[in-house]
Structure formats: structure tokens, C-alpha cells
Amino acid sequence: LDMGHMVNAIAQIDEFVNLGANSIETDVSFDDSANPEYTYHGVPCDCGRTCTKWEYFNEFLKGLRKATTPGDSKYHEKLVLVVFDLKTSSLYDNQASDAGKKLAKSLLQNYWNNGNNGGRAYIVLSIPNLAHYKLITGFKETLTSEGHPELMDKVGYDFSGNDEIGDVAKTYKKAGVTGHVWQSDGITNCLLRGLDRVRKAVANRDSSNGYINKVYYWTVDKRATTRDALDAGVDGIMTNYPDVIADVLNESAYKAKFRIASYDDNPWETFKN
């Protein structure tokens, strides 16, 4: 996946997909009552980016739905997966379940159109804090109680705090998650981070008893770092410049081994060479 980073205004969906992204990441901020409120990052953010673009969350979902509904004038066939970077650190730990419930209601209504020809993209719920794992259970319970448990087929998970791989595995056990796991690793583009933990995540993904299905690395803006990440075997790279990732994927060394994922690829299935 060529993942566009920090896509928080509806107009940016077109912008990033047109540069080559087949996936986007969107920040979600919550109000004091754990309602998803804005798609907003705020200051500070990645070097070279405007930190303050925003929409109301439900309005963003409607724009995203149009971009991922075949036949809509705004439809992008290429856009197959969306990562919601859930900014839950503003919440108390005991609000995580409520945040999940409210998130599910918002998505059901505004993105999935109550199960009636809604947006088709796969969704990854990315949570920054292992203590907030009940967001997942709250989300699942709500889709089930609202009569749409089948939509969970479209939902995956990520814990984005660069925690020990073993601790993440234990947390998924507590949350009752047995698949659909993306593991992120990374740091803001203003700083450098090695690939040690990415390699551990890839090893877990490729082992017979690992919990990880896919690994992505963030935020990569340079060709050299893109090559290093691909050499380490990642499934996705998050970037401020999707055209840079697309260019590297076109280099002869990588063209033979990697391709841009399409909607027919299963994002929850570990790729076997």
C-alpha cells in the first residue's frame, strides 16, 4: 500500500490519490464525551505539512463514502483502505469503549450508509494506547447490536504506539481479536528511526504462530528510506509524498517483487511468497 499521510480535508482525498496513494490515513479527534468530532491533527505535525486542515468527522465520512462508492462522480477505484488514526490520548482509559461505540455509529450512518451500498474501502482502526483496547470491543458490540455484524469483515486493527510486539499480542488476546491485524511502526518525518522493530514485526508476520497479518512503516518521504523499508519486507509505507513511493515501486529492482494493491487483494491475509 502507498499510504497518504494526514488526509484530513475532503479535498485532500483527490489530491493524494491522484499522486498515487491507494490508501489514506486520517486523524480523528474526540470531544470530552468520547464522540469522534473532527478529522484534525493539530500542531505540531510532520515537517513540511500544514497541521490544521480539518473537517467535521461525519462530513469527512460522507466525502470518503463518495470517493469509495462505485458509480459516484467522486469515485476512486484505486482507494482501497483507510486508516483512522484515533487520537484517544485526550480521553480517560475508561472512555475507550464509549469511543468505539460512538465511532461505530458514525461510520455505520455516514460511511456505510446503514449497510445500504455505502463506501467499500477497508477500514483500519489505529489506536495509540494499548490500554484503550476496549475501543475495539465497543465498536464490534455496536455494529452487532445495530444489526450489521457483517461489516466487521471490512475492519482491521493497529496499535500505533511502537510497543513491544509481545505486549501488543497480549492486548489483542484481551480484545478477542484473532485476525485483521496491521502492525505499524514509525516516527514523524522530522526524526529518524531505524528498522529494527519493523524487522521484528515482519518476522512475527511470517512466522507460523504470529499475530500480525501486515506491517506498515511511517512516515517515509525519501527514496532511500522507501527502498530500505521495501527491502525489510513491509506491506505498506505511509508518506507525505505518494508519488515518491510510486516512483520507487516502478524501479526495476522492486517492480518484480512488489505491486500496488487493488480491491481484489485481501488486506487481512498474510502474503506468502
Curated annotation (Swiss-Prot):
Give the main EC class: lyase
Question: Which GO biological-process labels does this protein carry?
Answer: killing of cells of another organism; lipid catabolic process
Localisation per UniProt entry: Secreted
GO MF assignments? lyase activity; metal ion binding; phosphoric diester hydrolase activity; toxin activity
* Catalytic residue positions: 5, 41 (nucleophile)
What are the names of the required cofactors? Mg(2+)
Q: Where is it mostly found?
A: secreted
**Of which family is this protein a member?**
Belongs to the arthropod phospholipase D family. Class II subfamily.
Tissue specificity statement from the Swiss-Prot or TrEMBL entry: Expressed by the venom gland.
Tell me which EC number(s) this protein carries: 4.6.1.-
Matching entries from CDD domains are given as: GDPD_like_SMaseD_PLD
Listed SUPFAM superfamilies = PLC-like phosphodiesterases
Spell out the protein name for this chain: Dermonecrotic toxin LdSicTox-alphaIB1bii
Known role: Dermonecrotic toxins cleave the phosphodiester linkage between the phosphate and headgroup of certain phospholipids (sphingolipid and lysolipid substrates), forming an alcohol (often choline) and a cyclic phosphate. This toxin acts on sphingomyelin (SM). It may also act on ceramide phosphoethanolamine (CPE), lysophosphatidylcholine (LPC) and lysophosphatidylethanolamine (LPE), but not on lysophosphatidylserine (LPS), and lysophosphatidylglycerol (LPG). It acts by transphosphatidylation, releasing exclusively cyclic phosphate products as second products.
Sites binding Mg(2+) sit at 25, 27, 85
Keywords of the record: Cytolysis, Dermonecrotic toxin, Disulfide bond, Glycoprotein, Hemolysis, Lipid degradation, Lipid metabolism, Lyase, Magnesium, Metal-binding, Secreted, Toxin
Catalytic activity from the UniProt record: an N-(acyl)-sphingosylphosphocholine = an N-(acyl)-sphingosyl-1,3-cyclic phosphate + choline; an N-(acyl)-sphingosylphosphoethanolamine = an N-(acyl)-sphingosyl-1,3-cyclic phosphate + ethanolamine; a 1-acyl-sn-glycero-3-phosphocholine = a 1-acyl-sn-glycero-2,3-cyclic phosphate + choline; a 1-acyl-sn-glycero-3-phosphoethanolamine = a 1-acyl-sn-glycero-2,3-cyclic phosphate + ethanolamine
Which residues does the record list as glycosylated?
Answer: 250
Cofactor binding notes: Binds 1 Mg(2+) ion per subunit.
Q: Name one GO cellular component term.
A: extracellular region
> What is the organism field in this record?
Loxosceles deserta
Q: Which Gene3D superfamilies match?
A: Phosphatidylinositol (PI) phosphodiesterase
Source organism superkingdom: Eukaryota
Report the SS bond pairs: 45-51, 47-190
